[in-house]
Amino acid sequence: MANRMHCFDVTDPAAMKERLDPVSAQRFIGVARAAAEQSGFRPEEIRFVGMLHTKRSLFDQVMAALGIPPERQVYLDEYGHMSAIDPLVALYEAERRALLAPGDLAVLLSAGTGYTWAATAIRWGP
């Protein structure tokens, strides 16, 4: 604890952004597809993606690659980035806006500061 080995400090945010930008979209897309497949679905069956709040261009790129049309998207511009809860708030908004039907496949996407990306596949409904 005294040596701060228990946490990750970003000492150069600009350099980190420069390294993340070229890989983030493909990593988000890859983990989304893998989550669908590992859950017994085809990636084309994904009906909703709840994503960590990012810059709009990255969000748009991921949604387009996964085939999610604008009318089925939730971009958290009314909330802003709230950290790990972003995908859950997007899922809440999708449910509130009636974007999900029983049996739909929803995928939640997130990322960590240590160059990690993750996805969870959820079959919606009873």
At which residue positions do the language-model features occur?
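Condensing-enzyme catalytic core mediating Claisen C-C bond formation in acyl metabolism
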Residues: 1-26, 30, 111, 124-126
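Short hydrophobic/aromatic-rich motifs at helix boundaries and adjacent loops
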Residues: 3-6, 30-34, 59-64
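General structural feature for long, well-ordered alpha-helical segments within catalytic domains
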Residues: 16, 24-31, 42, 54-58, ...
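A short, structure-level motif marking secondary-structure boundaries and short turns
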Residues: 16-18, 43-45, 75-76
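Phosphate/pyrophosphate-binding loops at sites that engage ATP/ADP/AMP, CoA/4′-phosphopantetheine
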Residues: 29-45, 94-99
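Claisen-condensing/thiolase-fold acyl-transfer catalytic domains that form or cleave C-C bonds
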Residues: 47-126
